[in-house]
Amino acid sequence: MRIFVIALTLLFGWLQYTLWFGKNGVSDYYTVEDEIEVQQQVNSKLQARNNEMFAEIDDLRQGLDAIEERARHELGLVKDGETFYRIVDEEEH
């Protein structure tokens, strides 16, 4: 019986050691948890940067569209290959 208790104590000690210090143990868990937190911060910064770039792209696209629309309506400009038709109300003449 004494050998059995010693064997169980050794087994329990080995299990505790592997739990706290072994591969995929508690120390590895905390290390990975810290790495995840750092990576999430990096991802947040990159996501914010991407959102800013998408907003800038949308502004540039809409800006060009707005400039083109203004040139068409106010200045009567047309693109190559297009034909411009102006419909005039009879009341204006």
Curated annotation (Swiss-Prot):
Residues 1-3 are cytoplasmic. The keyword Ion transport does not apply. It holds the Pfam family DivIC. One of its GO terms (biological process) is FtsZ-dependent cytokinesis. Residues 22-93 are periplasmic. GO terms for cellular component: cell division site; cell septum; plasma membrane. The chain crosses the membrane at residues 4-21. It is a single-pass type II membrane protein. It is found in: Cell inner membrane. Essential cell division protein. May link together the upstream cell division proteins, which are predominantly cytoplasmic, with the downstream cell division proteins, which are predominantly periplasmic. HAMAP family: FtsB (MF_00599). Belongs to the FtsB family. Part of a complex composed of FtsB, FtsL and FtsQ. This is Cell division protein FtsB. The gene is ftsB.
